[in-house]
Every structure is written in structure tokens, then in C-alpha cells.
């Protein structure tokens, strides 16, 4: 499946790159938060190949041992690399119990540029300013707009028509 670049969201992340805010990407399930984080990671790596990116995806069983805030906090700190720009990407952060304690602790250390995604009702409805002690920048990701849907559908339709005409 072809990845549809959603430039409006990527540009928002690029604009806050390196700011001290905790960047929070929210949206309903399957709206493209994880794909946005992947695209942003690719952008960062192309601009700063020497950086250190600590990525945790709680959708994968590889990270089941990090489901407590203390384990998450310790894991990130164990992967810190002094002398490099350190980024933390945590996908579906709400799956970690008391995740805000880990995120607040990492943010307070001032060693990381932090990006998290979440999709549960608690994270979507909560006041992020009270959940996180530091400043936050929220990007709300929505499912495809009608224009995006039509662009994908038209591309698929054209490929199908071309195949039939051969």
C-alpha cells in the first residue's frame, strides 16, 4: 500500500523540532499517527544522521516489558547518548501505566526532544497542560479528508483502468 504523505501534519512537527515542548500527536485509532511519526523520523534522520532516536512502539510485543512508567523511564535513560541530539518517540503511550510520570521526568531532565502519540479517550479528552507539567504542543490528526480520500481513490481507479486497457 502506498503511503499518502500528509504534509500539513509533517510541517507542523518540523516547525516545532527542537523546541522544549512535549509534542503530543493525538487522534482516533487508524488516523495515521504512527505513519506520521515514521515520516517525521525519516525527515530527522535525513537532516541529522548523527542524532540518536529512541523509539518505542507499544503496539509491538517487543516493548511489553516497558508497560510501567519506571521501566519506560529507565529504558529511555539507558539509551541516551551524550554529545548527540536525543529524540524520544513513544507510540501509543497510553498503554504504559502512569506514562505521564515517565514523560514528565524525561522532560524535566532537558536531555530529550520528546514526541508521543496516543489515541485513547483519556488522552484525547484530558487537559494536556495538567497531565504534563511542562509545556505541550498538540497536533490533532484526523482521518482522511474527502480530498485525500479522492486522491487515493482516483490513483487506485486510474491504475485499475490502465491495467484493463493493456
Predicted regions and their residues:
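Pre-Walker A adenine-sensing motif
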Residues: 5-17
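Short glycine-rich substrate-engagement loop in P-loop NTPases that contacts/grips substrate
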Residues: 56-83
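Hydrophobic anchor at the beta1->P-loop junction of P-loop NTPases
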Residues: 25
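Conserved lysine of the Walker
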Residues: 33
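Short regulatory helix/loop adjacent to the ATP-binding pocket of P-loop NTPases
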Residues: 123-136
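Structural recognition of the conserved hydrophobic beta-strand(s) that form the central parallel beta-sheet
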Residues: 113-119
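Hydrophobic positions on the alpha1 helix immediately C-terminal to the Walker A/P-loop
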Residues: 36
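Single conserved hydrophobic/aromatic residue that forms the stacking wall/gate
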Residues: 156-166
Amino acid at each position: 500500500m502506498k503511503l499518502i504523505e500528509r504534509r500539513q501534519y509533517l510541517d507542523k512537527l518540523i516547525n516545532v523540532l527542537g523546541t522544549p515542548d512535549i509534542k503530543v500527536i493525538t487522534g482516533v485509532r487508524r488516523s495515521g499517527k504512527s505513519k506520521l511519526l515514521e515520516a517525521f523520523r525519516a525527515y530527522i534522520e535525513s537532516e541529522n544522521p548523527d542524532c540518536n532516536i529512541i523509539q518505542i512502539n507499544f503496539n509491538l510485543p517487543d516493548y511489553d516489558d516497558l508497560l510501567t512508567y519506571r521501566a519506560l523511564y529507565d529504558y529511555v535513560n539507558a539509551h541516551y547518548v551524550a554529545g548527540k541530539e536525543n529524540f524520544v518517540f513513544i507510540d501509543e503511550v497510553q498503554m504504559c501505566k502512569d506514562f505521564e510520570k515517565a514523560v514528565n521526568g524525561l522532560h524535566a531532565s532537558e536531555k530529550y526532544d520528546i514526541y508521543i502519540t496516543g489515541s485513547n479517550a483519556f488522552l484525547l479528552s484530558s487537559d494536556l497542560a495538567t497531565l504534563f507539567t511542562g509545556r505541550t504542543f498538540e497536533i490533532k490528526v484526523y482521518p482522511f479528508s474527502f480530498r485525500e480520500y479522492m486522491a487515493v481513490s482516483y490513483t487506485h481507479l486510474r491504475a485499475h483502468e490502465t491495467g484493463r486497457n493493456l
